[in-house]
Amino acid sequence: PWIGMFAQNTMWEWPEANVVILANTNLVETSLTWSRGMLDAQEAGTKFICLDPRFSPTAGKADQWVNLRAGTDPAFFLGMTKYILDEELYDREHVLAHTALPFLIDPETGLCLADVAEAVDPETGEPVEVKTFYMWDEATNAAVPHTTEGATPALEGEFTVNGKRYVTQFTRLREDMEPYTLEWTAETCDIPADVVADVATQ
C-alpha cells in the first residue's frame, strides 16, 4: 500500500488497483470526470473505500463507507500505517527494491547518509548536485551506495558507520508510528478499532 500526498496514481490506473481509499473528496458530486473513472474502476473490480463523516454521494457509491470524526483522516492513516507495519502487510521485496526505506539516516538530524558530487545537467548544461545514498549491506556487513548491484540491503536495524550511529528509514518510521495504536486511532476517529484493521488489511 501507498499512503500520502502524491502516493496515488492517475485515475486511469484505478482499474488496476485492488483498493482505492478516498479521503477529503466528494468526487461523485463535484467532478463528473473523476466519478466516471471511479465507476469504470468498480466495474473492473476495484473496491472503493470512502472516508467521510457524512454519508455523501461519494460514500453512497463507494463499496465501503467509514464515517470517522471530521478532520481525523490523518489519524486514520497513521493508525493504518502502524497496523500495516506491525502485521507485516507490506511487500518486503518491493520495499527493499523500490523505496528509500532501507537508506541509512542520522537519528538525531533525520538526514540521510549520502555523498554529494557535482555533475552537469545534460539538458541545460547547468551544474547540479548528485547524491548517492547509503544502505547497510547484510552480505558484507558494511554501508554501501544504494546503487550497488547484488547487495542485500537491511530493511531494519541500527548500524555504526565511521564511528557514528545510523538507522534505516524503516526503523525510524516504525519508531515514529509507535504511538498510533488501533485503540488510539479508534478513540481519535470515533470508530471501532476493527474497522481500522479491516481497511488496512485490504
Task: Kindly give the residue locations of the regions a language model identified.
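Glycine/threonine-rich flexible loop motifs
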Residues: L27-R36
